[in-house]
Curated annotation (Swiss-Prot):
This is Calsyntenin-3. It is a single-pass type I membrane protein. Keywords: Calcium, Cell adhesion, Cell membrane, Cell projection, Endoplasmic reticulum, Glycoprotein, Golgi apparatus, Lipid droplet, Membrane, Postsynaptic cell membrane, Repeat, Signal, Synapse, Transmembrane, Transmembrane helix, Ubl conjugation. Glycans are attached at residues 299, 327, 347, 508, 741. The cytoplasmic domain binds synaptic Ca(2+). The gene is Clstn3. It comes from Rattus norvegicus (Rat).
Length: 957
């Protein structure tokens, strides 16, 4: 039994051992397979075909292929064994594949034999082969246009290689079916062609006079000849011939004073004719050199403006008007600017040496304040002289000053477009320092104001009220020091060594006669005006800006909406503005906000030329456009003229004793000065109204400043021995006003408010010497503002002097006329010869009949005389005011005397004096006599509906 079990066990072991020895080899397959599967199909065609071989064949199980295993993430395929004996297999898609989703698939496959099944411990597996499966496309999608409607514009008369391009796309994945092979224009008889890329061109020159808009339809085909499902529409507009230029601007731009900032080009746009640009630069230039000194500034005089701006006093005029006390300017050529200021011309061979001490106000002794703390102020118009070029310096001022420690020296020169200030704090020890500025204003041949503040070691230069720090500071220690002698020269400078230039005999050398001769060189060539120096205290920046800054110019404030890449630059004088950018639309927006601004309420009217120049850079230099220059002008309109109205009592009489008093009689005791601006508006739509409605409002504060008033005489000048005009000098000096008192006029000059001028003019008095035989005077008062630009009406005041006459005996036939005689009147000397002496100096008492006869005769004579007086009055009213200067201008006024015969008639002027005191009126209101009202009409201001500047004769102040 035991032997039987052992034999069975050995038999099974031998069988197993023989089976293991039979499955010796692994299956074999190709290393790589290429497969193709059609879209929407599942069978993969492999190259080479899928076969697995096993060298253990024909053994059962060991030589058979049981299957293929696929390896990869998300492989949408599966492997199928077709024949185990031959090892043939097949790869199929689990579901139809989509080429548009994935065109290619890559994975690995592995074959295994049939021993113990695919996962058996004794199963043999082949190596892993790579399988590439490409999904073949099917033309299932039609072309689709990117846009349904295409628009373009062309210029007439041109043939274009490409007007626009239409584009269609296809959703298929393969190049064969996804590419658009050609386009086609479906609309017949159109002058356009389309190529296979969708580019449309015109076949003939299009004319704007013909068809202005072309419409046609295009379609597309893919390479599988599948037509687009929806066709596209094309519209091409024909435009007239394009000229690159600025469009939408006005040549004439009107500016109303007081309007603030006014846009110059609110609707401007740049037409580039479709030429692409990558850089645009425009320059706007405002020409104001013809307005006063370079631009519109405050219209007040220099003296008045200094007071308004709060400038400190104490400046010394170094180039005053030639006169007995200022003869050093007599040899210079004198000109006058539009604002009547004095201008000196230096021709390059002239200079003036200002005497120290005396009228110049610069002492010859120590001048500590002037040595290191002072302000130089002057106007200059200078250009580069062609003969000199930029090589030679030109000296504006040169000064050596004596102080307690020794001598200091400074000079101000121009060199081309550079201005330099050389300062030598102490000639004995300190080294000179030179401050340099490079400014285009120095050499542009335009008027500019310069103010130099020295507070050593700080030096600040102001040009037209704008401060500039020095560009360079040099330590010029090698310069030879000038001679230690006080001297001040304008227009040139002396050389460092005595007689150095004189010995050379240079043509540009002149000797002065102040002390020892000084050789002169570096002459100035240009214009200077308003040259002054003030020592000890510097002018502040605010004061200098108020005094000399331009009140008009170009302006740009819309920085918040300034586009990206835009640059804006305005020069200091605001006469030049530059814009730079790279986008046309952004550039247009920026240029539309460039404005003109004039801060003066009463701007100088006239034309300001305007120029816009443009430079562009294109992507294509060959076809780059050129933008023509734009020229226009700003018209500053006439401002609404302020109407200065003087009013008060125009006629009064006083006893002579009042005029002979120590204070005289006030001429304008109730004077009123008003200033207003009248604006004329249209009348309301009312049939019963025939006139216009005028809206008058008070002017702003600056208008209420007067800069001068004049009291003149109508008729003969004042006789200083018998009469005079008086004013309180202390009150004038306290307010900084100047008084000029002549026999023909009295003037008050200086900027002050209307209230101050009213107060001062009410103190103006007329005084007579005791016993002066004067009976009537007429005075004319007028005022002005803004350097005499606007004048008031002429307010005329008539004054009658009432004289008393000593009581004398009268003949009986004139007793009844005693009611016309004032008890205190005294006949004037010139009428004494016509007085009637009494023929009855005895003590006889006449009878009653005689008295009655005398009274009747006297009454008859009185009636005749009154009739003659009335006839004479009517005659004077018709013939005008042709009477003597001493007579009253009022024919109806009883304050008169008339000598027309041997009789002397004295009319009591006090009879109507009370009526005149209550009934007299000034220019503003009240009732006047008929003849006075006709005279006053000429003196009144213009009617409120007239917008004009009042023309007046030149003033004496």
């Amino acid at each position: 039994m035991t032997l039987l079990l052992v034999s069975l066990l050995l038999a099974s072991l031998l069988q197993i051992s023989s089976g293991n020895k039979a499955n010796k080899h692994k299956p074999w397959i190709e290393a790589e397979y290429q497969g193709i599967v059609m879209e929407n199909d599942n069978t993969v065609l492999l190259n080479p075909p899928l076969f697995a071989l096993d060298k253990d064949a024909p053994l059962r199980y060991a030589g058979e292929i049981c299957g293929f295993r696929l390896h990869g993430s998300g492989v949408p395929f599966k492997a199928v064994i077709l024949d185990k004996a031959t090892g043939e297999g097949l790869i199929r898609a689990k579901e139809p594949v989509d080429c548009e989703a994935q065109k290619e698939h890559t994975f690995t496959t592995q074959a295994y034999d049939c021993v113990d099944g695919p996962d058996g411990a004794n199963t043999k597996k082949s190596h892993k082969a790579t399988v590439h499966v490409r999904v073949n496309d099917v033309n299932e999608f039609a072309p689709v246009f990117v846009e349904r409607l295409y628009r373009a514009a062309v210029t007439e008369g041109k043939l274009y290689d490409r007007i626009l391009r239409v584009e269609a796309i296809d959703g298929d994945c393969s190049p064969q079916y996804s590419q658009i092979c050609y386009y086609e224009i479906l609309t017949p008889n159109t002058p356009f062609l389309i190529d296979n890329d969708g580019n449309i061109e015109n076949t003939e020159k299009l004319q704007y006079s013909g068809e202005k808009l072309y419409k046609f339809t295009v379609t597309a085909y893919d390479c599988g000849k599948k037509r687009a499902a929806d066709d596209a529409e094309v519209e091409i507009q024909v435009k007239p011939t394009c000229k690159p230029s600025w469009q939408g601007w006005n040549k004439r731009i009107e500016y109303a004073p007081g309007a603030g900032s006014l846009a110059l080009f609110p609707g401007i746009r740049l037409e580039t004719c479709d030429e692409p640009l990558w850089n645009i630069q425009a320059t706007i230039e405002l020409q104001t050199s013809h307005v006063a000194k370079g631009c519109d500034r405050d219209n007040y005089s220099e003296r008045a403006l200094r007071k308004l701006c709060g400038a400190a006093t104490g400046e010394v005029d170094l180039l005053p008007m030639p006169g007995p006390n200022a003869n050093w300017t007599a040899g210079l050529s004198v000109h006058y600017s539009q604002d009547s200021s004095l201008i000196y011309w230096f021709n390059g061979t002239q200079a003036v040496q200002v005497p120290l001490g005396g009228p110049a106000g610069l002492g010859s002794g120590p001048q500590d304040g002037l040595s290191d703390h002072f302000t130089l102020s002057f106007w200059m118009k200078h250009s580069v002289t062609p003969s000199k070029g930029k090589k030679e310096e030109e000296t504006i001022v040169c000064n050596t000053i004596q102080n307690e420690d020794g001598y200091s020296h400074y000079s101000l020169t121009v060199h081309g477009c550079r201005i330099a200030f050389l300062y030598w704090p102490l000639l004995e020890s300190a080294r000179p320092v030179k401050f340099l500025w490079k400014l285009e204003q120095v050499c542009d041949d335009e008027w500019h104001h310069y103010a130099l503040n020295l507070e050593f070691p700080t030096v600040t230069l102001y040009t037209d009220g704008i401060s500039f720090d020095p560009a360079l500071i040099h330590d010029n220690g090698l310069i030879h020091p000038p001679r230690r002698e006080p001297a001040l020269m304008i227009g040139a400078c002396w050389s460092e060594e005595k007689n150095k230039e004189k010995e050379k005999g240079g043509e540009n050398s002149t000797d002065t006669t102040s002390g020892d001769p000084l050789p002169i060189h570096h002459y100035f060539h240009g214009y200077l005006a308003g040259f002054s120096v003030r020592s000890g205290r510097l002018e502040s920046r605010e004061v200098i800006e108020c005094l000399y800054a331009c009140r008009e110019g170009l302006d740009y404030r819309d920085f918040e909406s300034l586009g990206k890449g835009m640059k804006v630059h305005v020069n200091p004088s605001q006469s030049l503005l530059t814009l730079e950018g790279d986008d046309v639309e952004t550039f247009n927006h920026a240029l539309q906000h460039v404005a003109y601004m004039n801060t003066l309420r009463f701007a100088t009217p006239g034309v300001r030329p305007l120029r816009l120049t443009t430079a562009v850079k294109c992507f294509s230099e060959e076809s780059c456009v050129s933008i023509p220059e734009v020229e226009g002008y700003v018209v500053v309109l006439q401002p609404d003229a302020p109407q200065i109205l003087l009013s008060g009592t125009a006629h009064f009489a006083r006893p002579a004793v009042d005029f002979e008093g120590p204070e005289g009689v006030p001429l304008f005791p109730d004077l009123q000065i008003t200033c207003s601006i009248s604006h004329q508006v249209e009348a309301k739509a009312d049939e019963s109204w025939q006139g216009t409605v005028t809206d008058t409002r008070m002017s702003d504060e600056i208008v209420h400043n007067l800069d001068g008033c004049e009291i003149s005489l109508v008729g003969d000048d004042l006789d200083p021995e018998r009469e005079s005009l008086l004013l309180d000098m202390a009150s004038l000096q306290q307010r900084g006003l100047e008084l000029t008192n002549r026999s023909a006029y009295l003037t008050i000059a200086g900027v002050e408010t209307i209230t101050v001028y009213e107060e001062i003019l009410r103190q103006a008095r007329y005084q007579l010497r005791h016993g002066a035989a004067l009976y009537a005077r007429k005075f004319r008062l007028s005022c002005s503002e803004m350097n005499g630009r606007y004048s008031s009406n002429e307010f005329i005041v008539e004054v009658n002097v009432l004289h008393s006459m000593n009581r004398v005996a009268h003949p009986s036939h004139v007793l009844s006329s005693q009611q016309f005689l004032h008890r205190g009147h005294q006949p004037p000397p010139e009428m004494a010869g016509h007085s009637l002496a009494s023929s009855h100096r005895n003590s006889m008492v006449p009878s009653a009949a005689t008295l009655i006869i005398v009274v009747c005769v006297g009454f008859l004579v009185l009636m005749v005389i009154l009739g003659l007086v009335r006839i004479h009055s009517l005659h004077r009213r018709v013939s005008g005011t042709g009477g003597p200067s001493g007579a009253s201008a009022d024919p109806k006024d009883p304050d008169l005397f008339w000598d027309d015969s041997a009789l002397t008639i004295i009319v009591n002027p006090m009879e109507s004096y009370q009526n005149q005191q209550t009934g007299v009126a000034g220019v503003a209101g009240g009732q006047q006599e008929e003849e006075d009202s006709s005279d006053s009409e000429a003196a009144d201001s213009p009617s409120s509906d007239e917008r004009r500047i009042i023309e007046s004769p030149p003033h004496r102040y």
